[in-house]
Amino acid sequence: ERIALAVAQHNGCGYCLAAHSYLGKHVAKLADAEIDAARGGASSDPRADAATRFALSVARNRGNVDGAELAGVRAAGFGDDAILEIVVNVALNVLTNYVNTVAQTEVDFPAARQRKAA
């Protein structure tokens, strides 16, 4: 859910923000502060933070990450298979963000909370 939240925030998909905020809280049991952090590409958990930061960089840079970013996510314990899974998760969320934005999907989840200023 953290990656989905970061990508939805980056892409401005209101439907996906609402859906993943709800799922993050009620299924993944993330605290509101953790949901807010994920929307900014961060986490209070060091390993999740590395994955979420890397995922947001993949989205922002359209896959053009540098060696330092790869080294950082590897240093957090992610191997090539897990890095590929992060990239695929980003790609899937970009797809659903675009589809729901173009389709102007009606938000049928509670609205995402406003993020607190950092």
Language-model-detected regions and their locations in the chain:
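Hydrophobic alpha-helical segments
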Residues: 1-118
